Structures are given as C-alpha cells and as structure tokens.
Amino acid sequence: MIRNLQEGPNTVEVQETSFSLDVFGRYICNTYDEAISNGGFPFDAVVIGAGMYGSYVAEKIYRQGQGNLRVLLLEAGGFLVSEHVQNLTRIGLNAAAPVSLDPGVPRERVWGLPWRSNVAFPGLAYCVGGRSLYWGGWSPKLTDADLKNWPAELQTYLKANYNDTEKETGVDPTTDFISGALYDALKKAMDTAATRVPTVDGVEVAPLAVQASAPAGLFPFDKYSSAPILTDAVRQAAGDPDSTKRLFLVPRAHVVKLHNTNGVIDAIELRYNGQQKFVSVSPDCAVVLAASTIESTRLALESFPTPLMGRNLMAHLRSNTIVRIARSVLGTLPTQLAAAAMLVRGSTPQGRYHLQVTAAALDGSDSEATMWRVVPDLDLLDQLLASQDFSKVTITFRGIGEMVGDKNASNTNPATSWMDLSPFDSDEFGMPRAYVNLVATPLALTFWNTMDQAAVQLAQTLAGTPANIEYFYDNAWHTAPPPAGKVRDGLGTTHHEAGTLWMGTDPASSILNLDGQFHHIQNGYAAGPALFPALGSANPSLTAFTLARRTARAIVQKAVPVPAVGTLSLLNPALDGWQMAGSGRFNVIGANTVESEGGIGLLWYTKEEFADFLLTVQWRSINSFDNSGVFLRFPVLGNQNPAEDWKLAVDQGYEVQIDDRGFDPNTNTTGSPLHMTGAVYQLAPATRLASKPLGEWNTFEIEATGPDIKVRLNGSLVSHLTNNQGRPLKGHIGLQNHHPGSRVQFRNVFVKRVGAAVEARRAASSR
C-alpha cells in the first residue's frame, strides 16, 4: 500500500505521483477553472459524460463544426488510459462483475453502480472513454426487420450512413482481423449447418470494430474505442490559449441537475471535486446528455420530466453456449490455427436473435484466449500456439436476443420493464437515484428458449454425431447439452440498456425528435442507445454511433447553417478575399468565425462590391464596453496612409453599430439612439435595443436597396435609413475592430443580391 496524495497550495505543470508523471491526464484534461474562468466566450455545446458516446459526439461536434463551436465535455470520473485496454499489454484492467448493490467504493478501479435494480448490473466505468475501453467490439447493423418499428426517415438515414461508421470504427473491411484456415473451414461448415436449423436466417462475416490493416502510411488502431478520437481532438485544440480554445475536457465533474426556464436549459449544476458548481448556458448552447442510458434518463427525469421518460426500457437476452467438437469434422486443417469468428442471424415470430460465434483450437473453454489482446512477447505467443488441442476445436455461441419495450409501462408494475427516480434512495450528492425494473416477460422467456435451442442445434449439426461434441457448463465438460437456462447471463449484464428516451416525430408519443433533441427542451439533446425506439438483436454500438453523428450534425448546422442557394458566404479559414485596414486584427477562431482584437481598424472584403443586397451577420460580445460595427457600401481602401485609410469607410460608407451602451463620443454620454446597437451610425437611430444578453449570438439582417437601408436585429426592425445623404449606393462590406480590450465575434456572414442588383448581374453575365 502507498500513501494517498493530497493537493497542496503549490502549482505544477504536471503532477508527479509515487510512480509516474501524470502526462496523459494533464495533456488531455483541464481543471474546472481552466475551462470556465478563462475569460472566453460562452460554450456553444456542453456534453455530459465522456464515455463511449459522449466522447464520440463531442469529437463530432468539434470536428464537424470546424472549430466554429466551443465545446465543453464534463466527465464524472477521471482519466484512466487513452485506448481500449485490450490494445495494451497485460495491464490488469478488467470490466467489473455484476453486483446488485454497489459497495460504495470503485470496483476494478473505476467501476460503479449509480442506480438500484431488481437485477444485478456491472454499472458504469467512471473514466474518460467509459465502457468503450472495455467493450467486446461486435458491431452488427440493424436489419430491415429490426428497423420496422423505427421512423421511416431514420431507417433511410441509418442504411445510408452505417458504412461511414463501419469504416471509422474498423468494422469495414470485415475480414482484416479474422481470417485464416480455421475461419474458412468453419464458415463453410456453418453455411451448410445453418440451412438445417429452422430459425437461422444466415451466416455473415463477424462485424468487429477492430482495425488490423490501416490505410497506407498509417498504423492500425486495433480495437476501437472513443478515447483516441477524443484525445486527438483535444490535443488539436490545445494549441490555442484557454480564452479561445474550442474543446475542453473536465474530469471529476459530476452533473446532478439541469436547470431550465420555459423549456430552455440555462444552468448545469454539478459537483467538482465535491464542491457545488453552476455552469451558465445560453439558449444557443446545445446540452447533450450522454452519460449512459440509465443515467441520462435519470438526469432528464430529475431536470425536466415527462410521463413517457423511463418507459420502453430494453436490454438483451444473452446466453453463452460453449462446445468443443472434433477437429476432424472441419476437414484437413494446418497444425497451427488462428482464431475464427462469424455472425449467425436468426428470427422467430417472437423476435430476432443473433449468435456471435468464436472458435479456437485450444485446450480449454475460452475460445477467445488468442483474441482481443496484445501479445508483445514472441515466447508467450509460442506458448499460446503450443497449447492448441490438435483434436478439438472450442466454439462459443453467444446468443443475443431482442427484448420488446413497453411504451405504456407503469412504474408500479413489476411485470414489465421501466425505470424511474427512486423515492427511497439518494446518491452521495443527495439526489434521487434511478430505480431500474428489468424483467423478461413470458413471451421473452419462450423466445430465449428458442434462441438457446438454435445454438445447440447448430453446434450438433456441425459436429455430425454425439460422439464429436461436448458441452461446457457448471465448470466442466459434459456429453449432454446444458439444461434450459443453464448458460444464460443475467438481464442486466449486457451493457445494452436502451429505449428510455426514444425518438419519434410526435411529441405526444415520443421524447426526442429525429435529431436526438428533446421535444420540450429547446437546447437539450441526448446520445446513446437511450434514443432507440426499438432495440432489435444487434449490439447497439454501431447504431448509436451513427445516430450520434446525426445529432452532432444537427447541432452544428443549427449554429453554422449552410448558405441558401444564391447566397454567398464571405468568411473562410484563410480569410481569402479579406484585408485589414487600420490597426489591430481579427483572429480566425473557426472555419466561419472571427474575433476582433485591438483597433481601431476594419477587416474588409476586397473581392467585389455590392449594391442592392441582403446581408446576414451573426455576432456576439462578452463585455458591455465591447464596440464594433458592420460597414456597408464604402469605396476601396488602401490608397492613403494604411493606419488611417479605415476612416474612408466611416466618412463615405454606412456603419450598422454594435454598442449596447449607445456611447456618443461627441457628448461623452451613453444612451444615444444614433450610436446604439442596430443604428445606422449617426444617420438613422435605433428605435429599440433588441440585442440578446452578453455572450449570446445576435443576428443582423441588413437590407440595402437603393437609398433605403433596413436593419433587423434578432427579427425586429430596429432602424430604417431612407436618405443616403449623398453616400455611395454601392461598395464593399467590412467588420470593425474598435479598441484594445474589445472582443466581438462574427460568424455566418452571408450576402445575397436582391432586386436591381440581381438583374444587373444577370445582364452582365449574359454579354
């Protein structure tokens, strides 16, 4: 045993323990203060839970947003390892066994069970990457039959997008990990045997999330986990100062409640290292619940409950039929054999199942002894191969059967599956725990028997005669098949809980829309199997990842929409076509976002002039003294003193002002309508202050036609200039940086020609 380390007042860049430097944790994670108290703009997305799906969706929001969105990822646990534990040497990290009651201390270092139930569960891995560091890797698609109870739009989406996720996770190509003589022989024999088992529909290549061969020039990532993609994204973002950094991961941050006002989440309550904290969020900020099916649903029930939440709870019926058959029944095989794996799909009127088949010529009951691991020592590899049984092949048929959810479940009915907040049990933070009632109905039990019988029938058909097969149960080999129910796992052991926040088009009969957004919460989303309307027999990972990509895309497109047809997007990562006049600068924050620094100056678009147009600009400020503006119709700059040429835009163009104080430099007073946000500076007053609170995105819609300029701010007409007072009716567009310390961000700068300008451009292009 070693002494517990206590934090002290001294600070270090990287903490040192008795055995190691915490380089991984320090380089990937941030403290709460580093993420929240850095003087930066508010977050555009907050993801709760850095487990299998939280890490994935956070990375997708960051990547798809091309740096335009500021993302915060909150994780209740700490950092453990940076990839799947089976990609490491024999390190001794294992998934925890199921328990009925959590002992109050971590099991296997990071595992805890935060809910209570009528059945045993392994619980959650409280660490970055979560259960994706331990999962089995099986990733089958949902079939057409599985999807029949899903909304048609999602059926189409999944079929069109599954392959992108398969390529990302290593499922495609399918046979780069499992191949060889044993696979070829067993696949051929299995294809034949499958035709003789009535409920079997077919045999497929094993869909395993393992990349054994990478694209040219790259190393394979081996078994997939969400941790490496998150780590890479965090390190990519780490080059920026905290005040402009786009992705933060804060561990030891346990979210206990989401506070909302009129259907808008406005604060996240959490405990950070035991201290109560509140993170304020704006209506623009997407909050994604990705803390597992049970915990995400518990958090939703605690924060903004609806009667449907917690119904439709599903998991999988799982069995493990282990046999060994005579090696001779598979024909002549080489002396040394690699492992083999394949997927067998089946169906009955009661539901669908699949069998995950693994095989190895080893002396023992573990057909996966030479799979799912790194073997760094060639002598150890020789020992493993030498342990092969030259007369037998051990095969495991892991049956996975679907459960049908009950969308009308009552939380007082013990005969059906559901979850709710417990009225009797609170967690260490004083919040109600979830209670999970998970049961197999009589129909499910009948189906479970059928699935188990199919596994035995398939094994017997492979063996040919009873003399060629033995069955493993009760820790011994037997000549008789296992009795009914003997090889089953508990209902809570699969890690496949799903359905309690299901998606749909009708708010009266579903909880989330088809993008994973809560029907009744403007900025609330969820990710993971909780979204599933129905589960099918397929492991939920591939489908949940694919849906998370859709949710991330919806969040990004809401913040950074694609320009409409006929609309020109002016901003770009290289600021191509833009030039700085005066002092100061604009910093590129994302592919479509810039932030002012210093001043006074003007970033102006040089490529072309605009006459009649509709200009849309989103902007936000962080301090009441921030000042900026959008300039229109000014002549070419740069012909005079570079430090002064911006003044030409002031003297001859038009400025739509950004200054909520309405400061008038002529009288040194505030509250001037001619100098207030939305005014055409000193030409047309703002009739009202329509800007949103500091930190929130505002939208200008500026319509210029002839001498007429109308300014709408967040949908309200705030100023109208009807007399151009001799100023140009055509010119350039620019963004102002006003003074040192003023920070204003701009994004989505879209311009569309209207009216006479469109006709003139058409005429010019036809010549």
List each language-model region with its residue ranges.
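Extreme N-terminal leader/targeting segments of oxidoreductases
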Residues: 1-44, 63, 67, 557, ...
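N-terminal Rossmann-like FAD-binding beta1-loop-alpha1 element of flavoenzymes
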Residues: 43-72
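Glycine-rich loop(s) and the adjacent beta-strand/alpha-helix scaffold that form part
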Residues: 62-89, 258, 269-343, 528, ...
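Mid-to-C-terminal "cap/lid" subdomains and adjacent gly/pro-rich loops that border
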Residues: 78, 289-291, 296-297, 301-411, ...
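Redox-cofactor-proximal catalytic regions of oxidoreductases
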Residues: 84-85, 91-179, 185, 405-425
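Conserved redox-cofactor binding core of oxidoreductases
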Residues: 145-146, 151-257, 261, 466-473, ...
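A glycine-rich dinucleotide-binding beta-alpha-beta segment and adjacent secondary-structure elements
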Residues: 250-251, 256-257, 450-533
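Carbohydrate-interacting regions of secretory-pathway proteins
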Residues: 563-767
